[in-house]
Amino acid sequence: MPKGIGKFFSRIGEMTKGGRGDSEDSYTKELIGFSATKRQYANKFGVDVYSSNEVLQKELNSVAWAGFAGGVGVKLAMMPIKGASEAAYYSIQATKLTHGMNMILLDKAPEDLRQINREKLIQMGVKESVIYEFLHHPAYSPRHETILVHALADMQGVKNREQFIKKALYAEYEEEAFLYQRMAEMLHGYHTQVKPIKELVPVRKFMVGYTSDQTIVATFPIDLLYWIELSDLGSAALAKLDLTGRPVKKTEIWVTGSLTPRAMQEFNARGLVVNER
């Protein structure tokens, strides 16, 4: 059987298993090739093609239909999209991991991505019931799922990666799904660029890293961290974290933005080492 035919029937199998979410195009649009054109435009504009942003989806569909109907390539029909700035929150272009996955997200249909992600989750030892719940979670677009899964899959040898997927199920909205995605990316970045993480450890609803030199690494993709009740509870949990049989010499906090003076003061008072942007 030719590869294209095999891929087609494999994709149909994914379609019949769980259906598509609200942020995904219909099967008809996928099979006639429109969705592939739309993904090209989204990739060119640097936005999430599966975003729930209605303004973005409307404008993106308009541009993609024009290009699809006229057979015009992305390079020949560039035009601004209203709402793209609103969707920029969901598009992270600066991370090395995301850059390396752009072609995967561009070329693969949602069913293809779901297959790839399922295989990687199985390899990580995630139970089938958890895999199903994660891959059909309404808060996660195929982009969120794919980047998160690939970030963890690339951290080969790190223990408890399957626990991260379980924690990620706590997400109720797209913003929270994006938060878990970015946390996975940041842990991956620390693991590959700073020093290797030995295992992932649960702390409340999140996961932190534990290195071979006995350092706890917590990552927070936040622009500005205020001192509020959640900050108080989270920092207290990190400061008091007790890993049976595994001593903790230092606890590091990595944020993509910065802390308010009050938050920095409180974190430092608890012995937490903060790394700001």
Regions found by a protein language model. Give the residues of each.
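Membrane-inserting effector segments that mediate pore formation, membrane fusion
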Residues: 1, 59-98
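C-terminal low-complexity, largely alpha-helical membrane/lipid-association modules
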Residues: 1-69
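Acidic-basic catalytic patches of nuclease active cores, encompassing PD-(D/E)XK
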Residues: 119-206
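Conserved catalytic cores of phosphodiester-cleaving nucleases, focusing on short active-site segments
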Residues: 177-246, 251-253
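Domain-level recognition of nuclease-like catalytic cores that cleave nucleotide substrates
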Residues: 254-277
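Membrane-engaging insertion elements
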Residues: 2-3, 89-129
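Glycine-/small-residue-rich active-site loops that bind phosphorylated ligands and cofactors
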Residues: 26, 225, 259
